[in-house]
């Protein structure tokens, strides 16, 4: 799942086009209003993504002092990776796409691409761990239960996997002025400009890596998460019918339905946010001629913008829909502004639910007001 700041430039500067400086040509220049709206959208996402995820991390760590919780730890790791995505993806992508050449040096050329790929990998793998934890908690409550130590080891493992998986990107990106050599421009504004592009030993190597990255960063993890949540939903439905027959409290049934919708929304939203950019990358890698137009960068930025929305969606689902989180957030803001100590508050685990199986009786335990 390549979300690199330099993704658009290889398309239009790989020795195949005279479109490299399409912003220069009046006929290809995107409308000012479109650029302005994109900049505003990116700014809003950047602020919401950083503020939302940072708030979630702070509140979770404050809760961890009172009670260790596996799901909270995994959510904090997810929020950390989302912050890295905001910091390393959005600013460099916007600047590089609008300027149409790289101005941050060779080290940042390699580092930004590498960190971006690592961040995306950590995000999706964190979602996988959360799905596994919820599956064990709900579908298999009597089986193996992840503990806090398992959560930390899992986080270390996914960071190591992500760091290793993205090494080829670090090695393949280089600065070069070759894309600008064959341009026919009325001025020499691009004479000394360079682009940050992927340079592979062969096209086959690039296709193998990009396809493998797509499978490992998107298709396979998303499919696994979907299966886990599907089984969770089916399990919750079955238990809902059992609770209904026992005439249990209907408020619990309503919470059950809300959790079902929440679980499905998480998966659907993540998949939908990253789908356009993945389609763009697949087309670029296999049928790049389809993208050789003066509006190539604009299409890429729109796809990238939609993907970046996922950094705001995660805090929304995992935190802002949690009434206890909203209360804690207001207390945190009040503490930051007024400097007054926060009141003690109840630790609310962000897990979905747990079951109480005793004496052959199955009943739903209390489901928190947020995941």
Swiss-Prot record:
Pfam families: 7tm_1. It is a multi-pass membrane protein. GO terms for cellular component: plasma membrane. The chain crosses the membrane at residues 32-52, 83-103, 112-132, 151-171, 207-227, 264-284, 298-318. Kidney and discrete regions of the hypothalamus including the suprachiasmatic nucleus, anterior hypothalamus, bed nucleus stria terminalis, and the ventromedial nucleus. InterPro entries: GPCR_Rhodpsn, GPCR_Rhodpsn_7TM, NeuroY6_rcpt, NPY_rcpt. It is found in: Cell membrane. The keyword Membrane applies. Disulfide bonds join 109-196. GO terms for molecular function: neuropeptide Y receptor activity; peptide YY receptor activity. Keywords: Cell membrane, Disulfide bond, G-protein coupled receptor, Glycoprotein, Lipoprotein, Membrane, Palmitate, Receptor, Transducer, Transmembrane, Transmembrane helix. Glycans are attached at residues 11, 18, 182. Residues 53-82, 133-150, 228-263, 319-371 are cytoplasmic. Residues 1-31, 104-111, 172-206, 285-297 are extracellular. A lipid is attached at residue 336 (S-palmitoyl cysteine). Its main location: membrane. Belongs to the G-protein coupled receptor 1 family. Receptor for neuropeptide Y and peptide YY. The activity of this receptor is mediated by G proteins that inhibits adenylate cyclase activity. This is Neuropeptide Y receptor type 6.
């Amino acid at each position: 799942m390549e979300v690199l700041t330099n993704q658009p430039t290889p398309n239009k500067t790989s020795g195949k086009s005279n479109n490299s400086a399409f912003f220069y040509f009046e006929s290809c220049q995107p409308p000012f209003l479109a650029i302005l709206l994109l900049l505003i959208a990116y700014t809003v996402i950047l602020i919401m993504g950083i503020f939302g995820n940072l708030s979630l991390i702070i509140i979770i760590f404050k809760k961890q002092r009172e009670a260790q919780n596996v799901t909270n730890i995994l959510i904090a790791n997810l929020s950390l990776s989302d912050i890295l995505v905001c910091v390393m993806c959005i600013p460099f992508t916007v600047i590089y796409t609008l300027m149409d050449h790289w101005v941050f040096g060779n080290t940042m050329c390699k580092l930004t691409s590498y960190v971006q790929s690592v961040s995306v990998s950590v995000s999706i793998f964190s979602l996988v761990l959360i799905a596994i934890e919820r599956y064990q908690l709900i579908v298999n409550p009597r089986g193996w239960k992840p503990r806090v130590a398992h959560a930390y080891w899992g986080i270390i493992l996914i960071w190591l996997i992500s760091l290793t998986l993205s090494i080829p990107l670090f090695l393949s990106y280089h600065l070069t002025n070759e894309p600008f050599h064959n341009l026919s421009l009325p001025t020499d504004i691009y004479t000394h400009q360079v682009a940050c592009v992927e340079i592979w030993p062969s096209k086959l190597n690039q296709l193998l890596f990009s396809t493998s990255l797509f499978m490992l960063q998107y298709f396979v993890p998303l499919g696994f998460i979907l299966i886990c949540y599907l089984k969770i939903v089916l399990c919750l439905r079955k238990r809902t019918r059992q609770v209904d027959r026992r005439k249990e409290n209907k408020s619990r049934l309503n919470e059950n339905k809300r959790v079902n919708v929440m679980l499905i929304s998480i998966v659907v939203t993540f998949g939908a946010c990253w789908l356009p950019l993945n389609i763009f990358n697949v087309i670029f890698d296999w049928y790049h001629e389809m993208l050789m137009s003066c509006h190539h960068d604009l299409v890429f930025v729109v796809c990238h913008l939609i993907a970046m929305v996922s950094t705001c969606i995660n805090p929304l689902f995992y935190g802002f829909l949690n009434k206890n989180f909203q209360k804690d957030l207001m207390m945190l803001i009040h503490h930051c502004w007024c400097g007054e100590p926060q009141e003690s508050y109840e630790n609310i685990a962000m897990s979905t639910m747990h079951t109480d199986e005793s004496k052959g009786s199955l009943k739903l335990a209390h489901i928190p007001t947020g995941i």
